[in-house]
């Protein structure tokens, strides 16, 4: 081989890298190419999807992602605020976009499929599309009512199929959208579309993951941020599941605060009369039923003590402690359902804390003697309302006492008949 001759790799063709092949487009040229292609594809969304798929190899989607999504949604490039840049020149706009589509769920779902295919093909567009949707939600005031509706439907469908994360909804908490009622109106349409794709549990789960479950009231102005107003607004719109969800969330928040305050008062050994008064006021203020409070009281009472680690001593310690707080529990176990909840809580506690396993029957008898639990509640728990935890152990413990209750009941009935 000639020493000056450079080796050649035969059979190898050197290709220009794809990113170097892309044509150098300005945004306006990018727009014109996109508008022309969409107009040629027309209402055939399969043709639109194919055009977008193939054109991505020569158009710089990465650089002009905002222009791409502006045109697919609004038919035109959008200026800051949401106005159309080319509003006066119809040649630079297309009617084959989401805003010009028919206002029905199936049509918008077909458009959603175009976005799904595009983002699956060009994964790098995922974040750009998320940013675009956040931006479009900020621009809602610039869009007509029907355009807002279509955007809400598109957003709901894309949230339902997982193309978009629920975090896009943070744009709706913007003051101007909230004050003018646009945020709440848009949210209702969006949630309807979302729940047409997924069930309520899926929707609420997504809201929790995005930490939006506690912010739903912020869709309304400050003077209307009440659970009652939200519940009426969303129930009237056919979204009772979301109303119920918010009530539960608010109730959970209230219960946590109540439990924290109760724990504090018990640790300070506040008089029982004061604790009763406080709990009743909180129940009234937050519309909490007795059934929601009795379990909290039990938890707080049991957390207020450093328990002995010796099984033979803990029962005596527990009975002494619970005898002190029996009058408190008696006030909030005036209903049969509350009594059953308390019994189940005691059962679960004794099972979860092994040193209390043998103390269950003694605690129940104490509560019976202190008028916290009625014989009807104890018998119902024994026959059908017990939970699975430690079931055989606790039923066996209670057998003799239950037999005594049944015999006492029979004697009482026979005496009544004799009279």
Curated annotation (Swiss-Prot):
Source organism, top-level taxon: Eukaryota
Record's keyword terms, sorted: Acetylation, Cytoplasm, Phosphoprotein, Translation regulation
Annotated InterPro entries: ARM-type_fold, eIF5-mimic_regulator, W2_BZW1/2, W2_domain
Matches recorded under Gene3D superfamilies: 1.25.40.180
Annotated compartments: Cytoplasm
A GO term from the CC aspect: membrane
Pfam families, per database record: HEAT_5MP1_2 (PF25504), W2 (PF02020)
Residue numbers carrying Phosphoserine: 412, 414
GO biological process: regulation of translational initiation
Family of the protein in this entry: Belongs to the BZW family.
The protein's role, per its UniProt record: Translation initiation regulator which represses non-AUG initiated translation and repeat-associated non-AUG (RAN) initiated translation by acting as a competitive inhibitor of eukaryotic translation initiation factor 5 (EIF5) function. Increases the accuracy of translation initiation by impeding EIF5-dependent translation from non-AUG codons by competing with it for interaction with EIF2S2 within the 43S pre-initiation complex (PIC) in an EIF3C-binding dependent manner.
The protein, known as: eIF5-mimic protein 1
Annotated organism of origin: Macaca fascicularis
Lineage: Eukaryota, Metazoa, Chordata, Craniata, Vertebrata
